Amino acid sequence: EKIARRCNFDFEFGNTKLPYYETPGGMDHYAYFQKLCREGMVRRYGQHPPKAYAERLEYELNTIQKMGYTDYYLIVVDFVQYAKDQGIPVGPGRGSGAGSIAAYCIGITDIDPMKYDLLFERFLNPERVSMPDFDIDFCYERRQEVIDYVTRKYGADHVAQIVTFGTLAARAAIRDVGRVMGMPSAAVDAVAKLVPRDLHISLDQAIKKSAPLRKLMAEDPKVQELMDTARQIEGMPRNASTHAAGVVITRDPVASYVPLATNDDVVVTQYIMTTLEELGLLKMDFLGLRTLTVIQNAVKLIQKDAGVTLDMQKINYDDKKVLDSLGTGRSDGVFQLESAGMKNFMKELKPQS
């Protein structure tokens, strides 16, 4: 009772808690952000950018300031620039964040949203207030260097990786309950194998779909009890592990916001990613992408063996031979185009640009 009285379970939802970003010379954060964006616009588009481009940047700047996400952009561009300075391959942009011209100007992304008619509102919309989320890809082999940089910059007690829970799927629920009930493993395994192998199928769906399973439940009360109990625990957490990409960065020590634990000597939150977002904490995805590593290695080999230096920012996106290859389904090893479904789609689409 004494411990219970001392516990505090008051949570603050809907209030964003961004870590503090230190600007050069203590400059006003928004003024510094504007400076970076306007310098970046000149760098990207020249001294006299099209009027529509300048207007788009002003609109984004106003929206970002009003929604309180100036520091968010500054935090992201800081570690992205660090990675680039260290020669760590960084993806050009993925997801809705590629629709921000401000992100393009300051160097978070390298995809021109105006050229490809990308919408800023998919990323940040005043009518749908939610934390924006840049998905940043890094070289798989050097991703940890970027996380280490963020940890040094904000402090080890201000950075943690994020827990993720594996849940009990249909067959696992049957096997776990059968073991607790003391049923013979062979009998339990026979029941589990009657669950169709459809992806993410639930026990209720399995019962509807599998006539042999329904028959066994009707004939054997023990199997009926097994299934009834398994349905109650299906979907519950079974084991904890560390999220492959998620990192939380906080203004005050992480422990002042959420409980922590260690997993393989890594400090992780005991709250999952969606809960952290609801609490207003900054969650970043540091995605390790093997494709970037392969591309960098290929560029190095071309330089070494052929004496040709390739700049991946200046390659031709309208190479007819490449487009013809994609149109015939020859996309093995091409990121996001290598699945059977995408190959068939490319054959039907036959891209021309």
Please report, for each region that a protein language model flagged, where it lies by residue.
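Alpha-helical scaffold/interaction cores of sigma-54-like transcription cofactors
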Residues: 1-353
